Amino acid sequence: LIKLLYESKSSCRSLIEGNSFDGVWKDGQMGYAVWLKSVNQQGNCRWCRTTDVTFRNNTFRNVGAGFAFSGSPEVFPVDSALSRVLVTGNWIENINVQPYDGDSRPILLNVNARDVSFIRNTWTGGNFPKDAIIFDISNGIKAVTNFRFEDNVIPTAQYGVGATAVGEGTVALN
């Protein structure tokens, strides 16, 4: 069972650089290449957090979906939600192409992440029937504070930017 190519529930000051990630699909999860979050899974680790993470100059191929970032999505609280994440200079190709199917979204953000930046990345090839970027606010909590998206090449999919329960476009960014 392959759930994700890279996942962090608790890590600080991580640099993921110059790697080649290949092959993940919907099975145990929705096929995301990368999932970062701050998690206190059993209720005994309030200090568990994921902060100060950089993904730089990596290649991702044949994935069901791209990046999913969640501030603190679990029932048990953490002292610090996911924060200070930089994704820069990465190449992502063949999202949601059989047999590597999945959620199909290049970017999913939810549950109060902070200071998330995507700068100079390229997404190419794939099947994007949903939003290119989705802010999941279905639980009434802001998806992300201080989101930066600069100089990227990304397909528009059916919609460019969307937010659950709100819609697409400018309204999704507010």
Where are these predicted regions, by residue range?
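Glycine- and acidic/polar-rich repeat regions and solenoidal domains
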Residues: L1-N174
